[in-house]
C-alpha cells in the first residue's frame, strides 16, 4: 500500500484489468512499504508455458496496435478518481500492456493499500519473470479483441460489459519490484513520475493539489515505434544497462505505459511523492544513456487522457475531434512530434521517462523524418497550412493589384488588403516665373522657350533689348499655334485661359489683355490646355489648315500661316467671352516666297483662303484628287481632299473660307450700336449682332450661369426703325452696366487663371466638369441652330439652283457654282457646310449677319442662305476673277493699279467702319475680283462690332504678317487696324509678299512689335506719293495713323487708275492658272 500526503492513489484503468492476464502461474510478487520505501524484489519466475502465453498475448496486442499507429495519435484524458475506480474504469483485454500507446489513464495510487487485493495482484503479475527469457516482447496477433474500447474518459472505445474481478496484490508486486530494481531506480519513483504526468478528468475531481494539473498544457502527438517494440523480443541490447537478473515485466510495462503518456511539465506543482525519497530518487536513475532510446523523440505535455481516434479509411479524412474525446481540456501544441518510420532507428520505450529532460539526439533512421499528423489536430494543421498557402497567394495577388498590397506574408488577410490609391500632390506650388533681371536677361525662362526663341532667330541681344515684346509675341504665338507640341510648355505658365473646353473651337475667347486666347477661346475655357490639345486631335476631321497658301516649296509652312486676320475686340468686350481666336497668318507670297524658312513650316497660323500657288502645293502634298460632285446633295466633309481650282481660284477659296470656321478664329462681332443703320429687311427683323453678342455672353459668363440661362432668344429685338432717343439712352446705360460687369468678371477671371494651370486632382470633379462642358456645348449648339433657323430661308436650294459644279473644297464643306433657276444667266457661288464639322458655328452666324447687313458695291453680295438637313447653304455673288493673291503672284502691278485696289478697299472699309464693324483680316486673299476688274471684300468671319461705348478691342485675331503692332502687343485697338493691314497689303502688291514672310512666325511677330514700320526693299523705286501714303497707313502709333476717310482723300488715291485697268491682270492670272493645271 502506498500513500503520500494523505492522498490515496490506485492503479487506474486499464492496467488493473490487464494484470489478471499476466498472472499465469506466477509466484513472484512485489511488496512496497509505503512509509519505509522498501524496495521491490523478484520472487518467482514464470515457467516457460506461462511465459509463452504471456508473450503471445503481447505480440497479438502489438500486431493489432500497428494497424492504428500510422494513422492515429494519442491523447491523455483525465480519469474520474472515485473510490471504485477499479470497477468503473474498464478496459478491453485486447488493449493490453503490449499496446503501450493504448494504455492511457491516470494511476490513482491513493487506492493502493498494502493489504488491498488489487495491489497484491498487481505486484504478483508485474514481477512474473521468465528466468532466462528477457522482458522484451515480441509482437503477436490479437484477434477480435481489437474492437473493444475503453470508457469515454480513457481511450475511446466500448467498455467491457462484465469486467473480470481484480485480485492482484499490488503492494507485494511493487515491493518486490523496488527491491530488484534498486540500481535502476524504484518502481515507486516511476509510478510517482507517471502519477505526476496524469491529471484528473475534466468532469471529475482534481487529484493534484492547488489544481496544478489543470494548468498543464496538452499535446496531441503520440510516437509509436513498431520496430522498437518488435525487436525487443530476444534482443538483450535493447535493455541497455538494466540488470538482466532484475528484469521484470513491470519494467517494460511501466516503460511502455510511459511511452503511451505525454510528458508532463516539471512545474506541475509540488510532487505528490515529496515525502518518499526512494520513489522520487529512483526515477532519476532511469538510464537515459540507453542505446536503444531514440533521443530524437521526446514526449510532450498533456493534461488529458490518451484517447485514440477510431480507424479511418484515409488519414486525410480524419475529423478534427477525437472519437469519445474528453471535452474538458483543449490540447496545446508544445512541439511537433512525428511518427517514426518503419526503417527508423530503434528506440526504447523508456525514452520518455526523463520528466521533460530533453535527452534527444537526431535520429539517423532512413525514414526518421517521416511525419504523421497528430491526433485530433491533423485537420487543423492542414487547414493552417492551406490557409497559409492561400495567404501567401493572396499576398502576391495583392502585391500586383492596383488597389491592394501586402506588407507581410504572415499578416492577417485584413492586413494585406491595403488600399493602394495614390493620392494626388498636395500643397503643390508652381514656382516657374519668367522675368527680366537688371542686365536685361531673362530669368526662369523655360528650356522650351529658350529653344523656341533661339530657333526662331531672336538673339539674346534682341531679347534683352525688348524683353516685353518677346513676352508678348511668345504669348501670341502660343495662342495662334496652340497645337504645336513645342509650345505646349507655354500652357504651364502665366498665359493660360479660363475659357471652357466645351468645344475646342468655341468661338468667344477671353480677351483680357496680357492673356492670350487659344483655339479654345470660349468663356467656358476652364479646362486645361492639354485637354484642349486632346480635343483638337479628336477634331481631326477639321484640319487646322485647309486654306490656300502662296505657291512656294514651303507650302506646308504656309498652310499653317495662311493669311486670315479679323480685327480685335473692343476693351468692353475684352472679357473672356469676347476674346476671339487668332487666325493663322500666311501671307500670299509672290515668286520670292520660295525663300520661306523650314522652321516656319511647323509653326503656322490658320489661313482662310488659298492662293493659286498654295493650292498647287496643297494638291502636290496631299496627292488627293477630289472629283466634282455630280449632285449638290453630297456633303463635303473631306477637308484633306485636293482643292478644286475654279475659274477664279482665290475667289472660290474665299467663298469656301467664308463658311469655314477656323479653329484659330473666333466670332468677335459685337452688337451693333444703337446708331447702326442696317436695313430691317437685310436683318430679317432680327438684330443679328445682338444674337452674336448674346452667344458670346452665354459663353463668357460661366461664373454666372443663371445670367447666361436668363438670356432667352426673345431678347432679340426687331428693328424696323431706329430706336428713339430714350431707347438710346437706355441702351447706353445698359452698355455701361455691361462694361462694368464685364470688367468685374475679368478681375474674377484673372484669379483663377493662375490656378487653372494646376491639373484637376479629383477625378470626380474632372468628370463633373467634363459633363458640364458637354452640356454647355450641346446647349450652345442648339442655340446656334435655332438662330440659324431664324436667319436662313426656308426651302430646298436644290430646287432653286441647278448645274452645281464644285470649284473648291474647304475645311468643312465645298464651294460650288450654280445657276439660278429663275435667272439662268446669273451665276452664283454656293458654300455648302456641314454644321457638325464646323469648329466655330458662331463665325458662320457672324458672317451671314454682316453680309446681310452690308449691301455695298465693294462687299461681296449676299444672296440667301438655307439650312437643309444639317447642311448650311450660303448663296453669294460669284467673283470669277479670283483673289488678289493670284494677281500679285503672277503679275507686277503699277502704282496706278495699286492705287485702284486701295481705293476700292478703302470704300468698303469706310462702309464697315461706319457700321461699327472691324474686318480684322484684310489681306490679298480676301480681296476678290471679277473679270471686269471690280473689287469686293469677302470673308467676314472675323469681323468685330464696336459701338460708342466699346471703341477699342484687345483680342488678337487675324493673320500675323498683316497684323498691326497694337494687336501683337495686346493693346487696345480700333478700326485703324484695318488700315495697317491695308498698308501691308500695299507692300505685298509692290514686292509680291508681305514683310517678314521669310522669317519664322515668332520672329516675324517680334519684328512687327519692335521694328515698327517695315522697310521696303527698294524704296527708291517708288514715287513719293505712294511712299507717303504707305507711311501714313503704317504708323506704329495708331493715333497718327489715317482712317478710311482721310486716306480716300489722299493724292495717291485720287490719282489712281480705274478698276478696268485690273481686268488684264485678271485674265493673265487665269491663263497662268490654267497652264499650271495642265502641267
Swiss-Prot record:
Active site residues according to the UniProt entry: 921
Ranges of Basic and acidic residues composition bias in the record: 21-32, 211-220, 706-721, 730-753
Domain Protein kinase: 801-1053
Enzyme kind, highest EC tier: transferase
Pfam families cross-referenced by the UniProt entry: PBD, Pkinase
Gene Ontology MF: a single term: protein serine kinase activity
EC nos: 2.7.11.1
Superkingdom as given in the UniProt entry: Eukaryota
InterPro entries linked: CRIB_dom (IPR000095), CRIB_dom_sf (IPR036936), Kinase-like_dom_sf (IPR011009), PAK3-like (IPR051931), PAK_BD (IPR033923), Prot_kinase_dom (IPR000719), Protein_kinase_ATP_BS (IPR017441), Ser/Thr_kinase_AS (IPR008271)
Binding of ATP, residues: 807-815, 831
GO cellular component, one term: mating projection tip
Catalyzed chemical reaction(s): L-seryl-[protein] + ATP = O-phospho-L-seryl-[protein] + ADP + H(+); L-threonyl-[protein] + ATP = O-phospho-L-threonyl-[protein] + ADP + H(+)
Biased composition (Acidic residues): 80-91
Positions with biased composition (Low complexity): 309-322, 523-548, 591-600, 679-690
Keyword vocabulary terms for this entry: ATP-binding, Cytoplasm, Kinase, Nucleotide-binding, Nucleus, Pheromone response, Serine/threonine-protein kinase, Transferase
GO biological process: bipolar cellular bud site selection; budding cell apical bud growth; cellular response to hydrogen peroxide; invasive growth in response to glucose limitation; negative regulation of gene expression; negative regulation of sterol import; negative regulation of transcription by RNA polymerase II; osmosensory signaling pathway via Sho1 osmosensor
Compositionally biased spans, kind Polar residues: 167-186, 282-306, 357-383, 501-522, 549-561, 651-678
Region annotation Disordered: where it falls in the sequence: 21-50, 79-116, 148-220, 261-323, 339-389, 501-766
Protein name listed in UniProt: Serine/threonine-protein kinase STE20
